[in-house]
Design a protein with these regions (language model features):
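Conserved active-site alpha-helix within GNAT-family acetyltransferase domains
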Residues: 93, 105, 117-136
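Conserved beta-strand in the GNAT
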Residues: 46, 52-61, 76, 81
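Active-site rim helix/loop that mediates acceptor-substrate recognition in acyltransferases
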Residues: 25-48, 58
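Conserved acetyl-CoA binding element of GNAT-fold acetyltransferases
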Residues: 70-84, 139
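A short beta-loop-alpha structural element at the N-terminal edge
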Residues: 1-14
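Conserved acetyl-CoA-binding loop-helix of GNAT-fold acetyltransferases
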Residues: 82, 88-101, 124, 128
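Helix-loop element at the rim of GNAT/NAT acetyltransferase active sites that forms part
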Residues: 11, 15-28, 65
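Conserved GNAT acetyl-CoA-binding A-motif
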Residues: 96, 103-115
Length: 144
């Protein structure tokens, strides 16, 4: 398995993988990944089994407050996806390590992430990866 930093030419591939995570049309996601792959404030990584992409991670700098942290900016894991056939084989862990290494390389001393309250698999992964749960939040909205 190979993990490498993505470049703008990888944007269609990133968009395909991300569409499985966020249930969005890859065509809508692709321009965003073009921007992310050239931004000094973000990084995307791809995992390959041979020549087949099997996962991705997106991380970026957050300058606003991140729960449980005391510095700024903070590296933040924005998205992580591994194809089902390759899950529980260390792929996600290696992708997160690549993001953490990137965050360190741009001067971060803290790294954050989040997950949905009902995503037990993500919670278990985060805890096993060394993250500590620091808060639980339910957001509300109403039309005016």
């Amino acid at each position: 398995m190979l993990i490498r930093k993505a470049s703008p030419v990888d944007s269609p591939l990133l968009a395909q993988l991300a569409s499985r995570l966020w249930a969005q049309d890859p065509a809508e996601l692709e321009p965003e990944f073009v921007n992310l792959t050239v931004s000094p404030e973000a990084a995307c990584f791809l995992a390959f089994d041979g020549v087949v992409a099997i996962g991705f991670a997106q991380c970026q700098l957050r300058h606003d407050y991140v729960e449980g942290t005391s510095t700024s900016p903070v590296g933040f894991l924005e998205g992580l996806w591994v194809e089902e056939a390759h899950q529980r084989q260390g792929v996600a862990t290696q992708l997160v390590h690549a993001c953490e290494d990137w965050a360190r390389s741009v001067g971060c001393t803290e790294f954050g992430s989040d997950c949905e309250l009902d995503n037990g698999a993500s919670l278990a992964f985060h805890l096993a990866s060394g993250f500590e749960e620091v808060n639980r939040t339910i957001w509300f909205a109403k039309k005016l």
